[in-house]
Amino acid sequence: MTAPILKVERVAKTFLTESGAIEALAETSIEVRQGEFVAVIGPSGCGKSTLFNIIGGLESADGGRVLVGGKPIDGSHKDIGMVFQEESTFPWRTVIENVAFPLEVAGLGRREREEKAMRFVRLVGLDGFERRYPAELSGGMRQRTALARTLCAEPRILLMDEPFAALDEQTRMLLGEKLIEICTALKQTTLLITHNLSEAVQLSDRVLVMSFRPGRIKRVVEIDLPRPRTSDVIASEGFAGYLGTIWEELKAEAAKGLQAIEGQKRMPPPA
């Protein structure tokens, strides 16, 4: 078995708040191998986004480490590309100018970067829209632009934090199919943070289920379903079985999250 390209070793994080310390992550460990698509799913407040930020170098961990290709990293890293839930396209740039931005930063000439950027514009299905501005695009098209921009930098690892959460269900499913098509074509190693069970099963080779706070990996579910995961696969008993398995693991953790929210509501306001 090949060594993991991404390894998260016993990463921990605690936040200090007015009401006391909150342990967000407790010695969380993850391994992702080359070309693998792995989803991390958990209840609200389990530390998924904190984990995303630590792997992406946006936050520091209190303990543990992140390794890429066997080497520890500290802070943002050129081998990790990130796609966020929030709108991240540059409104003053066209689609192709958005996609080519990493190449511009790297110092490539205009012709060379546009030629390379067009490859990724086509890959995400936006050819014909390359001269449009984000305001002229749908939400799904803007997310495809953001994805193409990230992939244009050719990261070894694609890190995604609920990239389709703001989109309607039909668009989510279509973009999910497009994402898998792209990742398969590029043999792209991908780690997806999500709260959507169907999305996790549809896209992933493995699903990592997180516990409620402090977050840690509670169970790893291997998804043994044929690809491409067409509507027939999604409607199958096997798909439903994986949904049931993951939900059984999540249910108690989600209940803990709701209890924590109710407890916060009952707390008296600070003096």
Task: Name every feature range the model reports, one short phrase each.
Residues Y133-L137, M141:
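Conserved ABC ATPase signature
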Residues I41-P43:
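The feature captures the beta-strand-to-loop junction immediately N-terminal to the Walker
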Residues R93-A100:
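Short coil-to-helix segment of the ABC ATPase nucleotide-binding domain corresponding to the Q-loop/switch region
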Residues G56:
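Helix-to-loop junction immediately C-terminal to a conserved catalytic motif
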Residues E104, R111-F129, E181:
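Conserved ABC ATPase "signature" region
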Residues G64-S76:
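Conserved ABC transporter NBD signature motif
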